[in-house]
Amino acid sequence: MASGGNQSPPPPPAAAASSEEEEEDGDAADRAQPAGSPSHQIQQRFEELCSRLNMDEAARAEAWSSYRSMSESYTLEGNDLHWLACALYVACRKSVPTVSKGTAEGNYVSLTRILRCSEQSLIEFFNKMKKWEDMANLPPHFRERTERLERNFTVSAVIFKKYEPIFQDIFKYPQEEQPRQQRGRKQRRQPCTTSEIFHFCWVLFIYAKGNFPMISDDLVNSYHLLLCALDLVYGNALQCSNRKELVNPNFKGLSEDCHPKDSKASSDPPCVIEKLCSLHDGLVLEAKGIKEHFWKPYIRKLFEKKLLKGKEENLTGFLEPGNFGESFKAVNKAYEEYVLAAGNLDERVFLGEDAEEEVGTLSRCLSAASGTESAERTQMRDILQQHLDKSKALRVCTPLTGVRYVQENSPCVTPVSTAAHSLSRLHTMLSGLRNAPSEKLERILRSCSRDPTQAIADRLKEMYEIYSQHFQPDENFSNCAKEIANKHFRFAEMLYYKVLESVIEQEQKRLGDMDLSGVLEHDAFHRSLLACCLEVVAFSHKPPGNFPFIAEIFDVPHYHFYKVIEVFIRAEDGLCREVVKHLNQIEEQILDHLAWKTKSPLWDRIRDNENRVPTCEEVMPPQNLERTDEIYIAGSPLTPRRVGEVRADAGGLGRSITSPTTLYDRYSSPTVSTTRRRLFENDSPSEGSTSGRIPPQPLVNAVPVQNVPGETVSVTPVPGQTLVTMATATVTANNGQTVTIPVQGIANENGGITFFPVQVNVGGQAQAVAGSIQPLSAQALAGSLSSQQVTGTTLQVPGPVAIQQISPGGQQQNPGQPLTSSSIRPRKTSSLALFFRKVYYLAGVRLRDLCIKLDISDELRKKIWTCFEFSIIQCTELMMDRHLDQLLMCAIYVMAKVTKEDRSFQNIMRCYRTQPQARSQVYRSVLIKGKRRNSGSSESRSHQNSPTELNTDRASRDSSPVMRSNSTLPVPQPSSAPPTPTRLTGASSDVEEEERGDLIQFYNNIYRKQIQAFAMKYSQANAQTDTPPLSPYPFVRTGSPRRVQLSQSHPIYISPHNNEAMPSPREKIFYYFSNSPSKRLREINSMIRTGETPTKKRGILLDDGSESPAKRICPENHSALLRRLQDVANDRGSQ
């Protein structure tokens, strides 16, 4: 229920009052509220909260005004004080004037105090703050700050869970300490206790972490920083007089000479970093680097500032009775000042007695006298775990295209161990390499017609300078930040040369001795490859990486960046699971919205392709299409992916079972085709195209064929061959005379189809002109060639082509059934076609998932897909600066409406939010109007962003007058109502003259105008008339995994099993129940056992009396299975 008081629906946008009028009306309304009204009680509680926080008047007024504005437009569910705390935090982080420096960010009000006074936990605050940012439409920099704040909290929460068991491993339990006696003024300097060391070590760690902004939200480096703190404190504890009461004697890292004895300890403390790393999931090399370059210099500065007292030369003595009290107090005070100045979370809350209430997390295990957890602690531990699972800060969500193949992380795997494993795999990959080409790569580059070695080196040098300039370090630690940047780029160079060598080798295996100078001189390829390497290095050190920052600083268009992702994954075997999933996420982001930006090269490629977007059937392999008549492509089921298996090669989208695409295809321009399948009725052929209209039929590749003799050919179908029949073909000669030719076609041995003219009628006389006409291929009829020149004549196909399969019994297969030839290839392989193949595959997977959750039938799903494909092909600019999911949700809604199977936008968006890529901004911030580039496409695309006066009866019935705040949750909650977007109340922070609104506004004003006419053709009213054919749906086929090494220490691999479609034998044995004799069963058993067909004739005997090798019976020591596999291999080799 709403707790914001009696609220009336907001007025329509056109009648909205100005901000000044709203403030005046609001003030008058506040003065008119009776003392006992809910609004008055809320304001009274707000005033009390501000008084407790000593809030300044400007922040108080701004927070109250913002809260009133939100409560008028949204239903703010839950405790009103929690929403007021969000408004106060936003107001406190605004710039305020100062006496000396002009302005400063923040008013030094602690976030922790705001949450304590409003009785709100941190987890609740982050959940509500995300909704508040959406409702208020806060600028991106504020959202980034909140995300960084949440990430810092998440990192600290995870590290604190690791801190407790590590501390218990090296120090004694607090309950083992002797109870402290009451100390007088003269007895203050007593030895420190384990509990005090526990608090001191944590405060020292979080203070150091906060002063390293480049690693403060880095889980791996922050964890290593904690190990450095424990190493320092442990070494100091060994030198304390009461070290027997502090150090755990069972600690495995304690050597014999360091055991606590009565004798005086050594002056130099021991280093236990290596032992801590081996016992607690650390990386020794990384931890020692952090200790030498970050930790030690920082601790020396603390000694110089007198925050730590002791021996500065060896960083000891601060645990001595005379120094510990003052050192602890000074570090605590310095940390408090940092928290107030930076506005960050006070991470000492993890140590407090009320940690469950303040954080929503587990209590300190060191304060528990018993080893068992209470019900409250178990509940709070579960709350924290749910937040960590829901937060995407420290884990990579499996993309929807891979959730059925890869099992989620095991619950016993911690974020620290996962991050450490990713970094460890990176070090293993790069071990023994240098940031320069290997001797083998140098030879390969020199063998090119134009040696690109120097150009590659110059490009890397330029990109390093760019990377160093954009790496913005903190001024106090510029040297450390620069060293991190140098280290990351050096790792990226090593990985770049390693992957480049693998890519070139793979290309040479596919293309033979073809010169690769053209591809290796492609600047976009090299920049994309190095940017991808840098992203992998950045992600391994600090999830979730730096994308799209890396691509932007190098000016790499996203449309070019995506091309290298699959190449990178295929070329590098050592990538860990998390890195592959991260690259998959990047690829999906590019495909669903980043590549569709206004200035993307994608629009240039479409314009080069005659402003034409290829259809799904044109770019997808036929075996990956689900036919509209529900007949699936025949063939044996491919090997399913095993649970928990690393599927690096399946990380991309739309992986087909055909051979991988070459680099040349990925970076080539689209091939212009003048022939086009007219899928939609309003799709008229362009000038110069053939007049033939080819229905959606599976096609085979064209192959060169020989001329037909100059006589009339009679085609006799042969069992096992494919007969292609066509009614007529019209030939226009050079003199303009029209010739009508009946033709027939036979599938040849190479997988092509040869067409033969049967008879030519010229002026009523039959003439044989086949000698002057070459046989035609199916590719010519499909339109993949610009034109078909046939010895001075032009062939035009006025009628459809029927492809029929000739069965052994002489019966023909029904027209329209899919072919099972293993030689079927996609029609188009240009870079544009590859892009749309992945887009269609991604959209198909997401749409299928939504339809399952919305309980949509397969018939309606195919209609929705046809509508979506229509919007992509005919209304392409609908995607400009928009999101693929927006068009999918609109297509679901409009097709459900016209077919009377209504699905509300509320339910559609509710199901959408369950997908891993879902973000509330997708349906809350949709482009309505803005400066748009006209790509010169059809007239219907040029004015699609203009507002239209349409009846809103279809969508308005699904919308409620007040938006519920829970609609912004990334994951639906049981208590949340379905989302009903309305207008955004905050000031727009987008580009100037750009108007944005919610998804329903986009549907009413723009989408419906473009789609309505086409969608109505599938309505029940038009069911009796001819409706457009349904587009084939992408069929998800799982491929076999690639060769994967199980262990870096042992050469054990899992290799893929080639499970392609088995060719049907020419001789078959049929058994009919209650009809065939028993002899037929014995023949079948004999064929399976021996691998020979009983009806085969004996092979011709050779001179030595043996049979032909092809007819020889399998030896007894070989199984029939091996024989059959060998036959299959021979058949494939001959193709």
Swiss-Prot record:
The modification Phosphoserine is found at residues 410, 636, 659, 669, 684, 942, 946, 960, 965, 967, 975-976, 1031, 1064, 1076, 1108. InterPro entries: Cyclin-like_dom, Cyclin-like_sf, RB_A, RB_B, RB_C, RB_fam, RB_N. Residues 1-43, 661-698, 930-994 are annotated as: Disordered. Gene3D superfamilies: 1.10.472.140, Cyclin-like. Residues 414-1021 are annotated as: Pocket. This is Retinoblastoma-like protein 2. Glycans are attached at residue 417. Interacts with AATF and RINT1. Component of the DREAM complex (also named LINC complex) at least composed of E2F4, E2F5, LIN9, LIN37, LIN52, LIN54, MYBL1, MYBL2, RBL1, RBL2, RBBP4, TFDP1 and TFDP2. The complex exists in quiescent cells where it represses cell cycle-dependent genes. It dissociates in S phase when LIN9, LIN37, LIN52 and LIN54 form a subcomplex that binds to MYBL2. Interacts with USP4. Interacts with KMT5B, KMT5C and USP4. Interacts with PML. Interacts with RBBP9. Interacts with CD53. Belongs to the retinoblastoma protein (RB) family. CDD domains: CYCLIN_RBL2, CYCLIN_SF. One of its GO terms (biological process) is regulation of cell cycle. GO terms for cellular component: chromosome; cytosol; nucleolus; nucleoplasm; nucleus; transcription regulator complex. Residues 661-674, 683-692, 935-950, 958-969 have a biased composition (Polar residues). It holds the Pfam family DUF3452. The modification Phosphothreonine is found at residues 414, 639, 968, 980. Residues 414-613 are annotated as: Domain A. Key regulator of entry into cell division. Directly involved in heterochromatin formation by maintaining overall chromatin structure and, in particular, that of constitutive heterochromatin by stabilizing histone methylation. Recruits and targets histone methyltransferases KMT5B and KMT5C, leading to epigenetic transcriptional repression. Controls histone H4 'Lys-20' trimethylation. Probably acts as a transcription repressor by recruiting chromatin-modifying enzymes to promoters. Potent inhibitor of E2F-mediated trans-activation, associates preferentially with E2F5. Binds to cyclins A and E. SUPFAM superfamilies: Cyclin-like. The keyword Cytoplasm does not apply. Keywords: Cell cycle, Chromatin regulator, DNA-binding, Glycoprotein, Nucleus, Phosphoprotein, Repressor, Transcription, Transcription regulation, Tumor suppressor.
